[in-house]
C-alpha cells in the first residue's frame, strides 16, 4: 500500500515537473496593445533547433505544435552564420479588434525570408523576399524588409524562416505604419550622414 502511494506521488511529481519544463521551454505570449507602436519581437520568439528543421513550410504547418520549439532567450536575434535556414514564431494574443501591423526585418544580408500568416478564411499566406530571391524584393537601400500582417482578434501565430550568408544579427520589430515610417526616416538620415562623412574624408 505504501509502495503504491509512493509510486503515485512520484508519478504526480514527474508530471508536474514535466509541465513546468514544457511551459519554461516556450516564450511568453505577446499581448498586443494599441498603445505599443513598435515592439522588438526577440523576447517573444520561439525558435526551432537546427537539428530538427522541417523539410518545407508545408511540413511545418501540418503539425506546428508537435515540433520542439524553444524560447529564443535573446534581446535581439543573434544566431551567427545560418545558411540552412532558421524557423521562428511569435504567439500573439489580441484582446481588441483586428489590427494591421508591419513585420520589420532589418539588415541587408538576409538571403531568404519566408513569412507565413493566416488569412481571414483560415488558409495560410506565404510571402518571400531576400537578396537571393529572383524578384524586385531585394534590399536595395540596406534598410531591411517589411511585411504587412493582419493580427486577428484572439490568439494567432506568425511563422518565418531566415537564411543568411553572413552572421545573422537581425532586429525584428512589429510596428504600426507610422512607427515604420519614422524608423525608415531615421535609418535613411543616419545612412545619409555616413555618406556625407565619407565624402568629407
Language-model regions, residue ranges each:
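N-terminal signal peptide c-region/cleavage motif recognized by signal peptidases
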Residues: 19-21
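Core alpha-helical transmembrane segments of integral membrane proteins
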Residues: 183-201
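Bacterial N-terminal signal peptides that target proteins for export
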Residues: 1-10
Amino acid at each position: 500500500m505504501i509502495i503504491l502511494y509512493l509510486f503515485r506521488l512520484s508519478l504526480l511529481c514527474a508530471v508536474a515537473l514535466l509541465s513546468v519544463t514544457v511551459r519554461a521551454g516556450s516564450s511568453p505570449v505577446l499581448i498586443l496593445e494599441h498603445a505599443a507602436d513598435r515592439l522588438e519581437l526577440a523576447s517573444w520568439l520561439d525558435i526551432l533547433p537546427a537539428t530538427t528543421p522541417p523539410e518545407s513550410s508545408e511540413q511545418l504547418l501540418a503539425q506546428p505544435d508537435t515540433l520542439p520549439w524553444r524560447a529564443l532567450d535573446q534581446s535581439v536575434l543573434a544566431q551567427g552564420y545560418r545558411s540552412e535556414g532558421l524557423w521562428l514564431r511569435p504567439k500573439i494574443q489580441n484582446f481588441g479588434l483586428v489590427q494591421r501591423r508591419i513585420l520589420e526585418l532589418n539588415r541587408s544580408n538576409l538571403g531568404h525570408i519566408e513569412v507565413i500568416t493566416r488569412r481571414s478564411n483560415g488558409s495560410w499566406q506565404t510571402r518571400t523576399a531576400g537578396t537571393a530571391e529572383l524578384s524586385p524584393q531585394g534590399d536595395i537601400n540596406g534598410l531591411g524588409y517589411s511585411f504587412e500582417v493582419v493580427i486577428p482578434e484572439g490568439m494567432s501565430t506568425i511563422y518565418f524562416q531566415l537564411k543568411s550568408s553572413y552572421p545573422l544579427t537581425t532586429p525584428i520589430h512589429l510596428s504600426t505604419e507610422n512607427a515604420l515610417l519614422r524608423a525608415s526616416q531615421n535609418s535613411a538620415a543616419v545612412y545619409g550622414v555616413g555618406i556625407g562623412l565619407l565624402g568629407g574624408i
